[in-house]
Amino acid sequence: MLRNKFLLTLTIAISWMLVKIKFLQRLLPRKILNKLPLGWTDEMYSTVLKSRGKKVYVDIPCQLQQPTSYQPKTAVDPAYQLTEAEIQFFYQNGYIGPFTIVAPEVAEGIKSHLVEMLETESTIYPYSQNAYVIEAKDRATSVDRIRSNYDTSYLAMNYRDRHLDDSQLLDLFKHPALTERCAQLLGPDLMLWRTQFFPKAPSEEGTPLHQASTYLLDNLKEPVVYPPNLNELFQLTCWIALTDATKENGCMVVVKGTNKQIAPLKISKPYDTQKSDDGSKRFGTAKIDVDIEVNSEDVMPIEMKAGQFFIFSERSLHGSLANQTTEWRWAVNGRIVRPDTRLYTEKMLKEGHMYKVVGVKDICLDRWKTVLIRGEDRFGYNQ
């Protein structure tokens, strides 16, 4: 045990040195250089060293600044006006809504169209054209899982960024009910950079609580999102219910007030199971929890009718409940940034990206692009 801790400390210390002393990086073999966490900050290294590997950040540490005023950042149609009290609620709690974007019967039609569309291969990330590599090749489904590792990886990519090959989905995120409310929080200019479908099958487990800001978790080495100021609000996520989302069928949950700062993960052991009875995540023999004290009264289930959406900051601890029903729950989310935010590094765009959490690597981003959904892009940082 002591030897393992010493080796871990030594490995992290050497990694830190190589990241800080940049001229040494030119001497490293490419294979080793590609494994270095070049995006880690001093605080990230010191946290894992001081805790001897028991605490680790999986996103860049930051603290959300409160604005000098809670007035809307731009004027909008009065039908979509947010009050100062609502904007203050968002900053204090990390979410706002739900709001209606389309009628339930319209949402049902959109869902049917999109479910049919998802049966086709993505033209943005076509697996048949080697647009990415699935690391997990097993197709067997274990007793306590809905899908095999292979299917989980494939579906995660096939459900990603379909707004780029489906105009009906893109139009949903251009709806003024969504854009006008986001503009009051972010500013008049908005870019959609990522969408993802979130179907939850009958009996499917919930998603453990987690945080995100710059999406360093994608590859655990470098962020995906580069805003001018990490501590400002620079991104919003809109989660749209295509079917009713209830506590019974696996609605989202947000822990209010946890948007104030990004926290490290706590890693403890030993454990033998993959899933605990308290909803925390286990990897092998390690138990993973976010290092934030969660009070049960702060865990807010976000129940919605089909055709409603809510806006939240992924800095907030968020996840979803298990689907205890016999019906599927369908939803789609979109991540929206200001145009002064850079997305993906030049290396990621040229050589490919990784999505570790679903076991995918070498993602070709040639067909990916941002979409201006409101205002103008005065920076031109992104393709």
Put a short name on every predicted segment:
Residues 2-92, 99-221, 359:
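Non-heme Fe(II)-dependent double-stranded beta-helix
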Residues 2-18, 57-75, 120, 264-272, ...:
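Non-heme Fe(II)/2-oxoglutarate
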Residues 196, 211-213, 236-244, 256:
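Short, structured patches in soluble enzyme cores that scaffold and shape functional sites
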Residues 204-211, 218-221, 248-257, 263-267, ...:
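A short secondary-structure junction signal
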Residues 195-197, 202, 241, 257, ...:
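Short, well-ordered beta-to-alpha junction loops that form the rim of enzyme active sites
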Residues 185, 218-247, 303-306, 311, ...:
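Short, conserved beta-strand element in jelly-roll/cupin
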Residues 165-171, 225-226, 288-300, 319-321:
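Active-site rim elements
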Residues 232-235, 245-317:
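Double-stranded beta-helix
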